[in-house]
Amino acid sequence: QGEASACWRLTVRVLEAWRLHRVDLLSEADPYVILQLPTSPGMKFRTKTVSNSSHPVWNETFSFLIQSRVKNVLELGIYDEDLITKDDICFKVFYDISEVLPGKLLQKTFFLGPQGQEELDVEFLVEETPGPPEYLITNNVLVARELSRLDVHLDRAGSTPGGADWGKLELELVLKGSFEDTQTSALGTASAFRFHYLAAQDTELHGRLKSSRSSGWNTDSSAGHFTVPLQSLAGGREVTICVPATDDPGVRLQLKADSCPKELDVRLGFDLCVEEQAFLSRRKQVVAMALKQALQLDRDLQEEEVPVVGIMAEGGGARAMTSLCGHLLALQKLGLLDCVTYLSGISGATWAMAHLYGDPEWSQKDLQGPISHIRKHMAKSKLRAFSPQSLASYWHKLQLRASQGHPTTAVDLWALLLEFSLHGQVADQTLSGQRDALERGQNPLPLYLSLNVKEDTVDTLHFKEWVEFTPYEVGFLKYGAFVPPELFGSEFFMGRLMRRLPESPICFLEAIWSNIFSLNLMDTWYNLAWSGEEWKQHVKEEIHSTEEPEDCLRTSLWTEASWLQPGTALARAFKGVLTGRPLCHHGANFLHGLQLHQGYSGQKDFSTWADCQSDSTPSQLTPQQPQLCLVDAGYLINNSYPSMFRPGRRLDLILYFGYSLSSHFEALQQAELYCRTQGLHFPHVEISAEDRCQPRECYLFADPTCPEAPVLLYFPLVNVSFKDHSTPGVWRSPEELWAGQVDLNKTTTPYFLLNMTYSEEDFDHLLQLNDYNLQNSQDTILQALRMALKHRAPEARPQGAQ
């Protein structure tokens, strides 16, 4: 959605502060104020320092060019200058500029501390600016603004290379707030530079010639400083400037600014992409035929009558991979695999999915083939993965990856180890290559899920964002922003592709989806110490806290509450130890530079997935970060419910495969709580005390009073009748009873999370157990399919549903 919107001039006058407490023991504070507006990139101002004062008076004025359609939150930080150690930050204030009415001077007093003793007085004025409006593209949560491109050409005509000692001179250009920020080049090499920056950016290009020697930089020998205001380049004018140099005054720069294309390379929208919608139409033809045969229907189903069935597989390392193979094999034997439209998973379940989709016809072939491949590599010793030859191969591949521009981390090494362990070699298959498996609707659409978290400041419970991967696109559910998988990992700015990198082989994505090495100490503490009830209470409180700021934003009360008084350096260091992730994934952020819409927090599409306090502070959200930090989605809830409940998919039946060894209903009930708290329709899950002690093989959950809620079939990992039956209805002979003894005891099982090597016998037992449990529930599955058929019927759907 495109729109035109004018820019405004924000003037901020920092007046004075009152009753500032001392930070140093021997003297009063030496305060100064730093002002920053993230939506005006590159603009950062600082007042003068007032020495030894608890009542500093600054009376200084600063100016920002702002766009009224985005969320402009000014950050004012009060610092205490220290000549010996790092300056201490005393207070930080976040102020929503939308409270300032255009043309009316507003004086604001900020109460800084929790007791409100310290105060800061500031004046604000917003005025209209001349000039054409800015063209914006928005989905009402994110906003892409106009970009300009600055080309700089170094002209050395008339200069004498020998006389200027060219080998020791470098040209450094700095454009704060641009994608490139700083570029440096020796005068004897490249002579062209390019910067991408906000068209409505009120900043300057800074440059200098400086001397570079083999021993390092010599800042004292810097020469040729110059500044070019970007406004002087408006209208596509070409400007030539002379750059004074130490020995050669003849160096000139030719500068020209042009508009960047308005089209985006990031898709902004919450609807399903057109490729997925086309797939659904193709897949419904396959599903309709399979349902007609399975349910013995006497007529063909029309497209709008075909129910949408999805599989939701829990994580659990090799246990999840093996178990999912057993479940899919059983569905194939029952002739029900073609009834499934979506196949979603996290963590270890994605290993099975990624392997299967390497064959475009996998669900139309006997699954015993790919399962035998997995069995072979699961049973082999993994010591070869650590042989000198293998390690040398990993090193070569990581070097190649780095040379392509990808940042390499320990997660990439995990990817290579994982691929070698599971398949004996590193294949070149990609996520986008899985489209071949969807072109005729011959397989379900795979949905892979991950979490984006903070790298070193917050634990997973207090900041997490769902990131979905499909063969068609990768994106954030909360922001409604997606890119094709070919471009995931490439560098973006303001929705435009800046630098394209080769698509990563899927093993590197598998390592992200199952990245169990990014737990910080706080995550570990919550996992060990929190009970289920404490987790539920936290979810309710955290989500409730995201609902409060929207009301508060309409008044000045929110601004007074949005102060931050950071702790001491020791406290910050201790927090860093607790929340740091030493082995996390680093990747380019395709949301980088995009800004939040003025009314983003009130949008239903955003609030559906908003579940942490940071959601009310734009500068804390992902568009402001240069990199992503993706981890295993099982860190929060061990299932892929966000993919199943994404608006637009409207599932009628979910087959939920649980792979936990002990807490069989925990992730299921966590998903129910989360969905209900977020306003998503989830069938009511009620588990009796008897079932908690001795779970059954299959549960059916439905809510007839809520037509929006899908029917849900839950299959926990249990060994009930399989102990006595080789196949449904066939009792084991005394000689066969050993084959039904599958050890699922948490303390003695061979299927513990970190075990990557199963004996062939253990692999077969786990595979056959899941195969049997699902086949033994055939009648319940058929009942659920009939309910789904009824659920999809036009008279059963709420108005407006599809």
Region locations from a protein language model:
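Catalytic or ion-translocation cores adjacent to nucleophile or general acid/base/metal-coordination motifs
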Residues: 328-390, 641-646, 650-690
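Exposed aromatic-hydrophobic patches
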Residues: 56-67, 186-199, 589-591
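C-terminal, well-structured subdomains that either form a transmembrane helix-short loop-helix hairpin
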Residues: 307-318, 322, 326, 619-669
